Each structure stands twice: as C-alpha cells, then as structure tokens.
C-alpha cells in the first residue's frame, strides 16, 4: 500500500520546496553509511541519478569544494545555479549542500543528520516480481542485483527497445 499524509502541502511526497524544507526532529549520528547516503542524495538532486551509486558518491566528493562554497551563499552560487537550473530538485539540493556545511562545521563526532533522504525504487512492482520469480534479467534491470556491466538498470528502456525492435509503432 501507499502512505499519504493528511496535510496538503508540507509533506514528504509534496513539491521540491516542501521536501527541501523538511527535517527530522531527531537526527541520526554520523556513520559511513549516513555520509554515503548524503553523497548519493546530493548527486541525485543535482541530476546525476543515472550513474552507479559508487559513481554518485565519487561525483559528490569530486565537487565537494564547490558544494561547500555554494553552501555559504546558495542564492548567488554559480555552481548551484549550474546544477539546479530547471531541475525538479533545486530546494532539495540546497538542503543537501547545507547539510554538508553542517557536517564540515560540526565534525563527524558532533554531527547529526536531520535531512530526510529519499530512496526511490527503480520499478517496485517489477522488482518484487523479479525477486519472487528469481528472474535474473529482471532483477538486473530493476537494480535488485548489480548489473553485469556495472550500469544502472532501466527496465523501461529495455521494454521500449524491445517494442521498437519488434516493429511496434504508436499511432
């Protein structure tokens, strides 16, 4: 099933602005997994969501100096404008870079992460079906297991390619 909050606006399934403003009351202490999740979330919000999870972490650390610089003045940051222009996740990206600033300022010992980090299923229905039927190809294309080419699986593109390769057309 699905969970839908009663409120109309300020909720985790709301707009980018609503998601960017949300913070948990109780934070989670720093750990390698928390930092990795924050790095993946940052890359996702910057539009780098089609590369592997490891590459998203690497992408974030490659841009860390710019991320920390952008956190000083997000409104006037050229880097932030480059990675958030016309993005659906601009405010979430701002929240993520401010979280990196907090980690930098407090240090790992005193840091608590209050930022909700969304984890999106690739295609949850196909993921469940692939797992239950032990369909290796389906599991690879829905990212239940690692793809052999170390790519992010994309079941929708595989289906679309199959349809087009078999001569189906849309009229």
Predicted regions and their residues:
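Non-catalytic nucleic-acid-binding interfaces of large nucleic-acid enzymes and RNP effectors
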Residues: 2-171
């Amino acid at each position: 099933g699905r969970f839908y909050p009663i409120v109309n606006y300020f909720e985790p399934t709301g707009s980018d602005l609503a998601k960017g403003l949300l913070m948990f009351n109780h934070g989670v202490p720093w750990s390698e997994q928390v930092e990795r999740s924050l790095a993946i979330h940052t890359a996702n919000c910057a539009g780098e969501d089609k590369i592997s999870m490891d590459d998203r972490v690497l992408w974030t650390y490659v841009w860390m100096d710019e991320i920390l610089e952008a956190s000083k003045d997000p409104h006037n940051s050229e880097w932030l404008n480059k990675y958030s222009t016309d993005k659906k996740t601009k405010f979430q990206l701002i929240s993520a870079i401010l979280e990196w600033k907090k980690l930098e300022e407090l240090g790992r010992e005193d840091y608590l992460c209050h930022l909700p980090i969304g984890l999106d299923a690739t295609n949850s229905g196909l993921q469940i079906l692939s797992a239950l039927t032990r369909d290796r190809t389906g599991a690879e294309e829905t990212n239940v297991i690692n793809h052999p080419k170390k790519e992010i699986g994309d079941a929708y593109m595989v289906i679309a390619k199959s349809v087009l390769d078999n001569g189906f057309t849309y009229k």
